């Protein structure tokens, strides 16, 4: 039962298993796990996890239930009371396993089987889940890639659409352009037809003109015939006139006889007059008060003025009415005029130069013409013949003028017009009451003279002519009548004067005055007008009173009060001056008859300083017949200063003109200049202090002519800038301020024309008419603009003057300002908004006017000056910002602002058809023409009425400018493409260089263009590869096509004109000029053939290595396959190797092979195994069993100097040489597997070593490779830097090579010499590892005008690269192993003091010899930059004073520590001297010792601050030690470099620098060093050089070389013979103990001491 009951359970338990297996089999058949999705896999996983959990729960439940069922089944049937049942149970339990049968199935085994099955299923499911997850991740990655591809596809699609849109627009534009071009073709055809029609018309006109010309020729022949006929008539008339002349000569002879008779009669009359007694002359002389004035504008060299003196009769009435007079100083070198004199215009036609005619269009607005000065007379200038008397002041009487008559001016023919701009010649005169009549003259003639002259001015009883002032109610008609009468009298008087001329040589009869001057006006000199010197009257005898003649009017003069001047007595006492006890006065002269000239030798010469002349008076505004009063000559501030040259006249800016009339009241005696101060209240003239009270009666006083009313006086005041008088007149009522004279000039016009801004402001404030025009239509603004008075222009514009007013000829203020070149006025008018296009009647514009005078500034303003914003017309900032740059802009057209004037105005033609360009070209104004050509609308082909273009009328310079007008200046550039990669030392290599600019003209053909490009390239290649500084012009004469670097026109790969490819010799339909303009080509780029084409031309141009050498390097690589390039660091090895690899790769690819470049950078950690993996992975090393491929491999090993060549390449040397399967080599891989390999024949191996030469074990590798050495002193490195820097300079100057004297060339040459000198010095020192290639100097900055930039760059290069390398090289050379465990690395980290001193000395010498020497900077600037260089202040005397100590064999050259104990007395030490080696027998040059300078203490502090590390390393307790021969050799080599003549001599620098010392070769200078122990040493610190020490350092040898155990490296430098000799000599050893040191001086020792810093003690390093 138990068995049965137990046997049914397994069936139940197997049933679900069978069911599950069936279900699983069915599931496998239904679906595949690999095809499930992610969600289905997740669902399956969750179901299976739930099933596992359910199974676990079922197992647990079954375990709990099965225990109870088992007990029940096993023991439930049995009853304990039945013993047989227990026996049966025991029997079954005790039976054997084979015999007994299980009662029931074991449930634990079932459970274990189920659990094992479940675990297997779980493992399977986990594996399937991991696989599913990996597939899911891969799927997600693919989805992301798909999305990225879709996005990229979208972008490409969008870009494609954009390109389609752009292309569509381009196509539309092209279609549109085609339509426009077709329309233009039609228009051009129409224009051509019109032009042909015009041509036919012109031909017809030409035929007509030819006919007219023939007609004119016939007329001319007829005219010639008439001329011949008239000439014959003239000959006949000439013969008749000759006959008449003979008759006149006979008549003249008769007249001469009559003259002789008259002379005899005159002598008889004189004898009769001498017999008669005369009045008492001495008393008359004392009472005579005659003062004459000389007024002038010139210096001492003047012309005399003829005067005649009035006679003063002696009577009681005269004494009563005599005005107050005073003695005054005589003038210096100027004629003297009577106080009663009146000035008049010289009426001689030869004396005055007529001014510019008023009827001219605008000529009267331009400045005054230059007066013509007649030559000075010899000794005495006389009037109407020689003088008849010998007295110094001959006098005569002349008839007076009418009281209201004006002197003859413009109305009389032959007289200078009063409105003339030229200063008229004039004389000073005074009327006289008593006339002198010639006794021999006909009485009828004398009566006629007095008929016309006697009634003019009646003399008073004193003999002075007084003239009453004109009353205010004098009508113009009366004035005109008076003027007409005066003119008539003057005319008749001139006619009569021909017959009343005195006879030459006639003696004067006593009692009868000398002959009067009644002739015509003589050609006297220009009057010298002076107001600061007045002479007193001469005390000589007065002339007698002539007898009264019948017919003379003796009526008294009209009543007129005499104006008297009150003079202070103290002031008057100092005003007179006598010269040689005689005061010279010139006699008064008559007005119309003539001028008497006195002898200039009799004029006094005063020692008083000449004061500035009184400003002249311009009376051009006064009408004809108007006289000028003395008041009108006054100006504000017009008095001369007391000291010459301290003050200027008030109107010094106006043109210098002479007053036409100078009037003085007959009763006023002028005072001297000393009393005429501006502050004097009694001054006769108006001064800046105000209106003088004494001037009021002066205005009413009499004069030579009436003042013609207040308006005329107003014009005179305005013309002369007399603000005080003008303001007083403006304050009067009823005055017409707009009154105009005959020519239409108002007071405002006169003030504006003469530039009197204050007067203009006064008149404008008084509401004067601002636009009042004269008879020619010119306004005050026109006058001010023409004269350049910009302040008046600004003021008139502010008062709303018409800025566009045109005169009768069409001239506007802008036109007049441009015509006269007044830039400021042009600017003001343009800012006010004037019209620039107004034309004159002859078709001229302001542009024509500016160009006609060649005024560049005005033309620029017209073209480029913009009108500022409204209301800011006079804002300086606004106007300045809008003004075109008048100084620059010619060389930079792109920086010029756009012109503001239209093309129509630029091309406007005048009446003759000339444009502004025609005028500028014809006159040779190249600057103006160039400015006009900048306007794009200029039409240089426009023709004038004579069918001439601008080029036809242009000068040679302007023709050249016009020919190059439309020339395109396109820069020509050379491109080498991209230099890659940048880490190959190509950072400083330029990709593009501008070599020149090509001028492409309209007539340039494609052949000419090709030749120009080829020639420019050839010239550039030759210029940069030459030895000197060549310009492009210098190399044009060289016919060679190839340069020194091998580049030529054949090196060109392609040429691009803008963006269009072009090749030399190719031609397009369009000309080059049209092609460049249409394609907007801004540059021409020449691309050189490079490695991509299998050529090396671009590499040659980029690196400046000659093409032949690069090709040779490439041939070596192709031939030998194993090439190593080595040279000093910075020799461009990496760049050369990479470019060769690129070229080789593309050559192989062109031949049909696939090629690959493999680059490996070697460092100290790079092992042989890594190199093996590199060779194997790159298929260079091929297993013997494997067949070789056709692929070419180029392997580049860089920086091989960082590892040991023998260790790295030892195993590869044999297979590299024998590349075949016959000589395989076994290599062991990293996994320990060994295999045989051989090198592929198509493998190229190139390496680079930054080392000048190989040493030691590396030499074993040398024979297995082809070596290319890049020496610094040989090509290609020797000339590379020179060529590279020259190309950089040419590129900086845009293709033009500067002259060798240019500072840029000098600084570049200096940088080149620094590199060469530095390597030369380092080679002499035996430190090849410190040599530098040219790479570090390729970055030399080229900044024109800033050489300091290059010096600063050099200091950074020195401190960052050169100095550390030199320091390391010197240290490695001088360091030795002093102990077995003391390695070289430790020595480098902790150098000894001797090594530090040697390093600093080497740096200082290298800096001064190689770097600072030859610097083109001035010494002062170089001193400022010296502090930036490291190691430049080391004292060089230390090096020059050292010499290796003599020592025995086995002794070292160690320095002994000096005793600094204060207890040691100085008496035990003898002062050592410099022991010079006796080298006379050795033939060695004696090493020199520097003379210590005592005045260098000031520079020491500076050196200490610059070199702090020296004082830090050499302290008080240390001393210098030289422990090896190498250090001694270095010092000796440094010494020889200091005194070398083959190298740059630093002594040339030393004598002008503080941180260097001169090296004296005499060798006789004692040592100025003393012990510091003796404090009582008489040598002071100031007397000792800073470079010497106060302590004594002795050289002693204490230990032998064997004791030190020093392993010394032999020096590579040559050892001089003296050293061997010195080493063989014996020196005594000085014994020392721990407490005391006994120093024994050997006088025979050949040794020298080091003189170090005075505060530094030297100590031997502790052993």
Curated annotation (Swiss-Prot):
<dbReference type="Pfam" id="PF25408">
    <property type="entry name" value="AAA_lid_NAV1"/>
</dbReference>
<dbReference type="InterPro" id="IPR019131">
    <property type="entry name" value="Cortactin-binding_p2_N"/>
</dbReference>
<comment type="function">
    <text>Regulates the dendritic spine distribution of CTTN/cortactin in hippocampal neurons, and thus controls dendritic spinogenesis and dendritic spine maintenance. Associates with the striatin-interacting phosphatase and kinase (STRIPAK) core complex to regulate dendritic spine distribution of the STRIPAK complex in hippocampal neurons.</text>
</comment>
<feature type="compositionally biased region" description="Basic and acidic residues">
    <location>
        <begin position="1645"/>
        <end position="1663"/>
    </location>
</feature>
<feature type="repeat" description="ANK 2">
    <location>
        <begin position="743"/>
        <end position="772"/>
    </location>
</feature>
<keyword id="KW-0597">Phosphoprotein</keyword>
<dbReference type="InterPro" id="IPR002110">
    <property type="entry name" value="Ankyrin_rpt"/>
</dbReference>
<feature type="compositionally biased region" description="Polar residues">
    <location>
        <begin position="583"/>
        <end position="593"/>
    </location>
</feature>
<keyword id="KW-0488">Methylation</keyword>
<dbReference type="InterPro" id="IPR036770">
    <property type="entry name" value="Ankyrin_rpt-contain_sf"/>
</dbReference>
<feature type="region of interest" description="Disordered">
    <location>
        <begin position="454"/>
        <end position="478"/>
    </location>
</feature>
<feature type="repeat" description="ANK 5">
    <location>
        <begin position="842"/>
        <end position="871"/>
    </location>
</feature>
<dbReference type="Pfam" id="PF12796">
    <property type="entry name" value="Ank_2"/>
</dbReference>
<protein>
    <recommendedName>
        <fullName>Cortactin-binding protein 2</fullName>
    </recommendedName>
</protein>
<feature type="compositionally biased region" description="Low complexity">
    <location>
        <begin position="1624"/>
        <end position="1638"/>
    </location>
</feature>
<feature type="region of interest" description="Disordered">
    <location>
        <begin position="1446"/>
        <end position="1485"/>
    </location>
</feature>
<comment type="subunit">
    <text>Interacts with CTTN/cortactin SH3 domain. Interacts with STRN, STRN4/zinedin and MOB4/phocein; this interactions mediate the association with the STRIPAK core complex and may regulate dendritic spine distribution of the STRIPAK complex in hippocampal neurons. Activation of glutamate receptors weakens the interaction with STRN and STRN4.</text>
</comment>
<dbReference type="Pfam" id="PF09727">
    <property type="entry name" value="CortBP2"/>
</dbReference>
<feature type="repeat" description="ANK 4">
    <location>
        <begin position="809"/>
        <end position="838"/>
    </location>
</feature>
<dbReference type="GO" id="GO:0015629">
    <property type="term" value="C:actin cytoskeleton"/>
</dbReference>
<dbReference type="GO" id="GO:0090443">
    <property type="term" value="C:FAR/SIN/STRIPAK complex"/>
</dbReference>
<feature type="modified residue" description="Asymmetric dimethylarginine">
    <location>
        <position position="498"/>
    </location>
</feature>
<keyword id="KW-0966">Cell projection</keyword>
<feature type="region of interest" description="Disordered">
    <location>
        <begin position="1580"/>
        <end position="1663"/>
    </location>
</feature>
<feature type="repeat" description="ANK 1">
    <location>
        <begin position="709"/>
        <end position="739"/>
    </location>
</feature>
<feature type="region of interest" description="Disordered">
    <location>
        <begin position="203"/>
        <end position="222"/>
    </location>
</feature>
<keyword id="KW-0677">Repeat</keyword>
<dbReference type="GO" id="GO:0051721">
    <property type="term" value="F:protein phosphatase 2A binding"/>
</dbReference>
<dbReference type="GO" id="GO:0005938">
    <property type="term" value="C:cell cortex"/>
</dbReference>
<dbReference type="InterPro" id="IPR050719">
    <property type="entry name" value="Cortactin-Actin_Reg"/>
</dbReference>
<keyword id="KW-0770">Synapse</keyword>
<feature type="modified residue" description="Phosphoserine">
    <location>
        <position position="1524"/>
    </location>
</feature>
<feature type="coiled-coil region">
    <location>
        <begin position="119"/>
        <end position="276"/>
    </location>
</feature>
<dbReference type="GO" id="GO:0043197">
    <property type="term" value="C:dendritic spine"/>
</dbReference>
<feature type="compositionally biased region" description="Low complexity">
    <location>
        <begin position="386"/>
        <end position="396"/>
    </location>
</feature>
<feature type="compositionally biased region" description="Polar residues">
    <location>
        <begin position="1582"/>
        <end position="1599"/>
    </location>
</feature>
<feature type="repeat" description="ANK 3">
    <location>
        <begin position="776"/>
        <end position="805"/>
    </location>
</feature>
<keyword id="KW-0963">Cytoplasm</keyword>
<keyword id="KW-0175">Coiled coil</keyword>
<feature type="repeat" description="ANK 6">
    <location>
        <begin position="912"/>
        <end position="942"/>
    </location>
</feature>
<feature type="region of interest" description="Disordered">
    <location>
        <begin position="498"/>
        <end position="617"/>
    </location>
</feature>
<feature type="region of interest" description="Disordered">
    <location>
        <begin position="1"/>
        <end position="23"/>
    </location>
</feature>
């Amino acid at each position: 039962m138990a068995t049965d009951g137990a046997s049914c359970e397994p069936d139940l338990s197997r049933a679900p298993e069978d069911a599950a297996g069936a279900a699983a089999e069915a599931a496998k058949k239904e679906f595949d796990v690999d095809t499930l999705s992610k969600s289905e896999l997740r669902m399956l996983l969750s179901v299976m996890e739930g099933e596992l959990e359910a199974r676990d729960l079922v197992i647990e439940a079954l375990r709990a239930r099965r225990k109870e069922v088992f007990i029940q089944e096993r023991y439930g049937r049995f009853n304990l009371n039945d013993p047989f049942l227990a026996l049966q149970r025991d029997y079954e339990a005790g039976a054997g396993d084979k015999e007994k049968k299980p009662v029931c199935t074991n449930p634990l085994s079932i459970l274990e089987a189920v659990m094992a099955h479940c675990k297997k299923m779980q493992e399977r499911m986990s594996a399937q889940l991991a696989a599913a997850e990996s597939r899911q991740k891969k799927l997600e990655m693919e989805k992301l890639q798909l999305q990225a591809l879709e996005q990229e596809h979208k972008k490409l699609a969008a870009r494609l659409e954009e390109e389609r849109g752009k292309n569509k627009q381009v196509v539309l534009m092209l279609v549109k352009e085609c339509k426009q071009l077709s329309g233009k073709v039609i228009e051009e055809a129409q224009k051509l037809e019109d032009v042909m029609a015009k041509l036919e018309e012109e031909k017809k006109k030409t035929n007509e003109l030819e006919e007219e010309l023939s007609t004119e020729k016939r007329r001319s022949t007829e005219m010639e015939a008439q001329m011949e006929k008239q000439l014959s008539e003239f000959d006949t008339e000439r013969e008749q006139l000759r006959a008449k002349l003979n008759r006149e000569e006979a008549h003249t002879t008769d007249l001469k006889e009559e003259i002789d008779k008259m002379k005899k009669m005159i002598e008889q009359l004189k004898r009769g007059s001498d017999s008669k007694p005369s009045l008492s002359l001495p008393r008359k002389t004392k009472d005579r008060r005659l003062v004459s004035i000389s007024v002038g504008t010139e210096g001492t060299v003047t012309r005399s003025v003829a005067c005649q003196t009035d006679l003063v009769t002696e009577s009681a009435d005269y004494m009563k009415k005599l005005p107050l007079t005073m003695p005054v100083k005589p003038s210096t070198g100027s004629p003297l005029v009577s106080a009663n004199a009146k000035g008049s215009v010289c009426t001689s036609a030869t004396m005055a130069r007529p001014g510019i005619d008023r009827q001219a269009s605008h000529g009267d607005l331009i400045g005054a013409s230059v007066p013509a000065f007649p030559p000075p007379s010899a000794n005495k200038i006389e009037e109407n013949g020689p003088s008849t008397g010998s007295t110094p002041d001959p006098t005569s009487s002349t008839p007076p003028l009418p009281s209201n008559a004006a002197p003859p001016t413009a109305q009389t023919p032959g007289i200078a017009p009063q409105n003339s701009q030229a200063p008229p010649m004039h004389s000073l005169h005074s009327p006289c009451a008593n006339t002198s009549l010639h006794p021999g003259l006909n009485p009828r003639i004398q009566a006629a003279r007095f008929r016309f002259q006697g009634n003019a001015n009646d003399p008073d009883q004193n003999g002075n002519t007084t003239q009453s002032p004109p009353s205010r109610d004098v009508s113009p008609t009366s004035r005109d009548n008076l003027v007409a009468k005066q003119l008539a009298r003057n005319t008749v008087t001139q006619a009569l004067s021909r017959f009343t001329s005195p006879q030459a040589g006639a003696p004067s009869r006593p009692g009868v005055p000398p002959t009067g001057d009644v002739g015509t006006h003589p050609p006297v000199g220009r009057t010298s007008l002076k107001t600061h010197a007045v002479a007193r009257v001469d005390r000589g005898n007065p002339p007698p009173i002539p007898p009264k003649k019948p017919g003379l009017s003796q009526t008294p003069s009209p009543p007129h009060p005499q104006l008297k001047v009150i003079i202070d007595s103290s002031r008057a006492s100092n005003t007179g001056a006598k010269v040689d006890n005689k005061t010279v006065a010139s006699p008064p002269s008559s007005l119309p008859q003539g001028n008497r000239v006195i002898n200039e030798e009799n004029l006094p010469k005063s020692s008083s300083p000449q004061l500035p002349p009184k400003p002249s008076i311009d009376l051009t505004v006064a009408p004809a017949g108007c006289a000028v009063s003395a008041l009108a000559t006054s100006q504000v501030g017009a008095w001369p200063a007391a000291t010459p040259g301290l003050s200027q006249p008030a109107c010094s800016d106006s043109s210098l003109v002479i007053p036409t009339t100078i009037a003085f009241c007959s009763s006023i005696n002028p005072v001297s200049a000393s009393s005429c101060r501006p502050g004097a209240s009694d001054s006769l003239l108006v001064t800046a202090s105000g209106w003088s009270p004494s001037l009021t009666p002066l205005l009413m006083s009499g004069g030579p002519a009436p003042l013609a009313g207040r308006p005329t006086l107003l014009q005179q005041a305005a013309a002369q800038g007399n603000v005080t008088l003008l303001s007083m007149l403006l304050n009067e009522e009823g005055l017409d301020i707009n009154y105009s004279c005959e020519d239409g000039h108002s007071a405002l016009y006169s003030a504006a024309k003469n530039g009197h801004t204050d007067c203009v402001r006064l008149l404008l404030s008084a509401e004067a008419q601002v636009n009042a025009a004269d008879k020619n239509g010119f306004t005050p603004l026109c006058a001010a603009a023409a004269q350049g008075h910009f302040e008046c222009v600004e003021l008139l514009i502010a008062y709303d003057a018409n800025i566009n007013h045109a005169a009768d000829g069409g001239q506007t203020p802008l036109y007049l300002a441009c015509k006269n070149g007044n830039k400021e006025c042009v600017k003001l008018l343009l800012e006010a908004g004037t019209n620039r296009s107004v034309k004159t009647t002859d078709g001229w514009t302001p542009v024509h006017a500016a160009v006609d005078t060649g005024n560049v500034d005005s033309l620029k303003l017209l073209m480029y000056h913009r009108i500022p914003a409204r209301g800011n017309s006079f804002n300086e900032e606004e106007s300045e910002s809008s003004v075109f740059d008048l100084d620059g802009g010619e060389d930079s057209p792109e920086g010029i602002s756009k012109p503001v004037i239209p093309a129509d105005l630029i091309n406007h033609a005048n009446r003759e058809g000339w444009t502004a360009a025609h005028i500028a070209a014809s006159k040779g104004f190249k600057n103006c023409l160039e400015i006009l050509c900048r306007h794009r609308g200029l039409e240089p082909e426009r023709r004038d009425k004579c069918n001439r273009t601008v080029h036809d009328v242009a000068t040679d310079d302007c023709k050249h400018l016009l020919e190059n007008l439309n020339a395109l200046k396109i820069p020509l550039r050379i491109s080498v493409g991209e230099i890659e990669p940048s880490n190959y030392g190509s950072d400083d290599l330029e990709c593009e260089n501008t070599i020149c600019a090509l001028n492409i003209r309209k007539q340039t053909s494609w052949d000419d263009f090709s030749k120009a490009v080829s020639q420019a390239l050839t010239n550039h290649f030759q210029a940069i590869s030459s030895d000197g500084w060549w310009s492009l012009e210098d190399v044009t004469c060289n016919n060679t096509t190839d340069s020194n670097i091998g580049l030529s026109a054949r090196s060109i790969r392609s040429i691009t004109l803008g963006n269009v490819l072009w090749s030399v010799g190719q031609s397009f339909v369009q000309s080059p000029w049209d092609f460049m303009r249409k394609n907007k080509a801004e540059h021409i780029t020449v691309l050189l053939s490079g490695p991509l084409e299998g050529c090396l031309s671009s590499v040659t141009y980029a690196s400046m290595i000659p093409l032949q050498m690069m090709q040779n390097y490439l041939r070596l690589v192709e031939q030998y396959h194993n090439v190593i390039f080595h040279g000093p660091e910075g020799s461009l090895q990496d760049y050369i190797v990479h470019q060769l690899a690129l070229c080789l790769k593309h050559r192989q690819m062109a031949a049909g092979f696939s090629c690959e470049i493999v680059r490996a950078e070697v460092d100290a950690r790079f092992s042989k195994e890594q190199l093996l993996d590199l060779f194997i992975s790159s298929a260079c090393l091929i297993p013997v069993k494997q067949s070789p491929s056709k692929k070419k491999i180029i392997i580049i090993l860089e920086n091989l100097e960082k590892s040991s060549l023998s260790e790295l390449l030892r195993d590869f040397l044999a297979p590299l040489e024998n590349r075949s399967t016959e000589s395989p080599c076994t290599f062991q891989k990293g996994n320990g597997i060994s295999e045989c390999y051989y090198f592929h024949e198509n493998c190229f191996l190139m390496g680079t070593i930054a080392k000048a030469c190989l040493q030691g074990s590396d030499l074993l590798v040398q024979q297995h490779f082809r070596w290319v050495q890049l020496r610094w002193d040989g090509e290609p490195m020797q000339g590379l830097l020179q060529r590279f820097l020259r190309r950089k300079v040419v590129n900086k100057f845009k293709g033009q090579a500067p002259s060798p004297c240019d500072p840029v060339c000098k600084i570049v040459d200096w940088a080149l010499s620094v590199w060469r000198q530095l390597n030369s010095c380092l080679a002499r020192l035996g430190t090849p590892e410190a040599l530098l290639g040219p790479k570090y100097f390729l970055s030399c900055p080229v900044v024109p005008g800033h050489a300091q930039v290059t010096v600063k760059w050099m200091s950074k290069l020195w401190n960052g690269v050169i100095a550390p390398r030199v320091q390391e090289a010197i240290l490695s050379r001088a360091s030795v192993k002093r102990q077995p465990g003391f390695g070289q690395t430790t020595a480098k980290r902790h150098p000894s003091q001797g090594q530090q001193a040697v390093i600093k000395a080497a740096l200082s010498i290298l800096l001064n010899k190689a770097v600072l020497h030859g610097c083109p900077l001035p010494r002062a600037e170089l001193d400022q930059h010296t502090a930036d260089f490291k190691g430049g202040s080391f004292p060089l005397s230390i090096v020059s004073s050292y010499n290796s100590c003599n020592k025995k064999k086995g002794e070292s050259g160690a320095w002994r520590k000096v005793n600094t104990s204060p207890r040691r007395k100085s008496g035990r030490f003898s002062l050592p001297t410099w022991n010079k080696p006796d080298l006379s027998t050795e033939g060695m040059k004696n090493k020199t010792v520097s003379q210590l300078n005592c005045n260098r203490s000031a520079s020491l502090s500076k050196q200490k601050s610059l070199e702090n590390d020296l004082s830090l390393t050499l302290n008080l307790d240390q001393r210098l030690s030289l422990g090896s021969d190498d250090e001694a050799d270095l010092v000796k080599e440094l010494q020889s470099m200091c005194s070398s003549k083959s190298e740059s001599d630093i002594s040339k620098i030393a004598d002008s620098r503080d941180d260097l010392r001169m090296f004296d070769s005499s060798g006789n200078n004692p040592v100025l060093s003393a012990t510091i122990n003796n404090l009582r040493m008489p040598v002071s610190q100031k007397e000792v050089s800073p470079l010497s020490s106060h302590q004594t350092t002795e050289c002693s040898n204490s230990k032998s070389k064997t004791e030190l155990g020093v392993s010394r490296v032999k020096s590579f430098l040559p050892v001089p013979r003296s050293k061997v000799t010195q080493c063989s000599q014996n020196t005594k050893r000085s014994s020392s103990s721990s407490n005391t040191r006994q120093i024994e001086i050997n006088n025979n020792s050949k040794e020298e001491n080091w003189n170090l810093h005075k505060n530094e003690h030297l100590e031997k390093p502790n052993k």
